[in-house]
Amino acid sequence: MSPTLKLALDLISRPSVTPEDAGCQDLMIERLKNIGFEIEYMPFGEVKNFYAKRGNSGPNLCFAGHTDVVPTGPEAEWKIPPFAPEIVDGVLYGRGAADMKGSLAAMVTAVENFVAKHPNHSGQISFLITSDEEGPFVDGTTRVVDALMERNEQVDWCIVGEPSSTKTLGDIIKNGRRGSFSGDLTVYGKQGHVAYPHLAENPIHLAAPALAEMASSHWDDGNDFFPPTSFQVSNIHSGTGATNVVPGKLNAQFNFRFSSELDFDALKVRVIEILDKHNLRYDIEWTYNGLPFLTRPGELVDAIVEAVQATVNITPELSTSGGTSDGRFIAKMGTQVVELGPINATIHQINECVDAESLNQLSEIYARILENLFAKK
């Protein structure tokens, strides 16, 4: 069994459901110390984080990821116990196999192999690892980034090991992500008897036209790198449970995934204009999740594309689709950020799995990226 698969199995066997780390970071740290990395422990609250670096000058390439995983769901429905990983017919099963302990293992072994070959390499190699990516993401990467920015730590390039691939390893790499923010809207009416609607104000009826207008609005056209901004209602709650009572208020939650054509303030203004146009009595709370970011083709993207082509003989598609990741926090540093990892078909599902050989190939890709950036100068 390869070193990458051995390490992946060891990491997956540790039940690190957010915000637990279950010893995963200690395992990685031990390996990194052995090849000359300096380790900085950066815990915040209940969350374990660390920043490790090798080298003191030149561009800094950071490998970023998370040791926490989502809950398993009913363990009886797994064909393999989620924290007792096994390779069956060439497929590695276990919670975190794809998201993202397989990537972490590939990163560590890639760096081990690169350092063994180039002990005096140019540049700096770093790791930024958290146990709070799948949860509230309050005390994880965002806190580490803030601390690094306060001391003017420069991270030039970053590879996030999120499972970016769809059908085959390396077919898609994420060179950006849309921005995200949510609204929690409360619309007020007047409770009453359904038989006397003139004595009541139904907040469901009042809110429906405004929500429909937002759902049908054309927010922007997107651009060459981002699809158009999307609006989705995620939850609506109203009523007492009785069929003869007009409710007194309605709560609706919604989310925007927005392109670089708009920002939080512009979208907020348009939402308020729609709500006010419909003469609603309302309160609204906003949750800002992050701005869009984009890494244009250049030194990092070119190094990654070449490494994928050389290793698995395909040319990856550059994409900004999908949800958010911790890359949005790292991008605040002015860092070029790209996500590259395993196939994402089973992430967060029962029987999460990944092709075992693809993790060996992923390690080769990461190592070749290092070669392209630091050994071909």
From Swiss-Prot:
Function: Catalyzes the hydrolysis of N-succinyl-L,L-diaminopimelic acid (SDAP), forming succinate and LL-2,6-diaminopimelate (DAP), an intermediate involved in the bacterial biosynthesis of lysine and meso-diaminopimelic acid, an essential component of bacterial cell walls.
Positions annotated as active site in the UniProt record: 68, 133 (proton acceptor)
Organism whose genome encodes this protein: Marinomonas sp. (strain MWYL1)
EC nos: 3.5.1.18
Superkingdom of the source species: Bacteria
Keywords: Amino-acid biosynthesis, Cobalt, Diaminopimelate biosynthesis, Hydrolase, Lysine biosynthesis, Metal-binding, Zinc
Residues annotated as binding Zn(2+) 1: 66, 99, 162
Pathway: Amino-acid biosynthesis; L-lysine biosynthesis via DAP pathway; LL-2,6-diaminopimelate from (S)-tetrahydrodipicolinate (succinylase route): step 3/3
Gene: dapE
Cofactor stoichiometry and binding remark: Binds 2 Zn(2+) or Co(2+) ions per subunit.
Gene3D superfamilies in UniProt: Zn peptidases
Family stated for the protein in its record: Belongs to the peptidase M20A family. DapE subfamily.
Protein's UniProt keywords contain rRNA-binding: no
Catalytic activity: N-succinyl-(2S,6S)-2,6-diaminopimelate + H2O = (2S,6S)-2,6-diaminopimelate + succinate
Quaternary state and interactors: Homodimer.
Official protein name in the record: Succinyl-diaminopimelate desuccinylase
Necessary cofactors: Zn(2+); Co(2+)
Pfam families in alphabetical order: M20_dimer, Peptidase_M20
GO term, biological process aspect, one: diaminopimelate biosynthetic process
Binding residues annotated for Zn(2+) 2, in chain numbering: 99, 134, 348
GO MF terms, alphabetically ordered: acetylornithine deacetylase activity; cobalt ion binding; succinyl-diaminopimelate desuccinylase activity; zinc ion binding
